[in-house]
Regions:
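N-terminal beta-alpha lobe that positions the nucleotide/phosphoryl donor
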Residues: 1-207, 211-230
Length: 231
């Protein structure tokens, strides 16, 4: 490749799909080229949302009530949705950009929504693995920017309110978030740092939370890269 031919020491993957490609990060390592980002192992662990949920639960980080295992079939999904309690959010484990997500409000619409979300996941991410969460009504989408070095030091750079969305994609970001108190801001920031430390994270990343109307917050996912809107 050009990178090898030019004897580059490092490569920055930008903010697209390549930046979250664990295989590419591993290839850089094999070629003795520094991948400016987290390790392939962390990209894989946090990029798979089912695995990320499990990791955060083990670290004591609050997550949205939901499945602890991957879901592949409508039948198993229905069983788990009944246990969680409707309404539920059906999500693709490898999803992103609002793809592979559907809300199911009852048993009657569950099968249709599950199949639609799973087909989107297969088409967009070549993965049929799903998971199910309790649907948080009237939520706020609040995310924290974190930075981490290779020595285990992690800081956060404050929060953004990303609640104004269209088709599960952010339209507007506000900072600081006026919906949280200074005390809650500190608590959420500390949790974001703890989440990053739990996986030995390095480089820039984003910890995303859902905040319910009672001011309870839950880990939703982690972006293992700089955000596309913050190049």
């Amino acid at each position: 490749t050009v990178t090898v031919a030019m004897k580059a020491d490092a490569i920055h993957p930008g903010f697209g799909f390549l930046s979250e490609n664990a295989r590419f990060a591993e290839l850089c390592k094999k070629c003795n080229i520094t991948f400016i980002g987290p390790s392939a192992e962390i990209i894989h662990k946090m990029g798979n949302k089912s695995e990320a949920r499990k990791t955060m639960m083990e670290a004591g980080v609050p997550v949205v009530p939901g499945t602890k295992e991957p879901v592949y079939t409508v039948e198993r999904g229905m069983e788990l949705a009944k246990e969680i309690g409707f309404p539920v959010m059906i999500k693709a484990s490898s999803g992103g950009g609002g793809k592979g997500m559907r809300v199911s409000f009852s048993e009657e619409d569950f099968e249709m929504n599950f199949k639609t979300a799973q087909q989107e996941s297969i088409k967009g991410f070549s993965d049929d693995t799903m998971y199910i969460e309790k649907y948080i009504e009237q939520p706020k989408h609040v995310e924290f920017q974190i930075m981490a070095d290779k020595y285990g030091n992690v800081i956060h750079l404050g929060e953004r309110d990303c609640s104004i969305q269209r088709r599960h994609q952010k339209v507007l970001e506000e900072s600081p978030c006026i919906a949280i108190s200074e005390e809650l801001r500190e608590k959420m920031g500390e949790t974001a740092v703890r989440a990053a430390k739990a996986v030995g994270y390095e480089n820039a990343g984003t910890i995303e939370f859902l905040l319910d109307k009672h001011k309870n917050f839950y880990f939703m996912e982690m972006n293992t890269r700089i955000q596309v809107e913050h190049p």
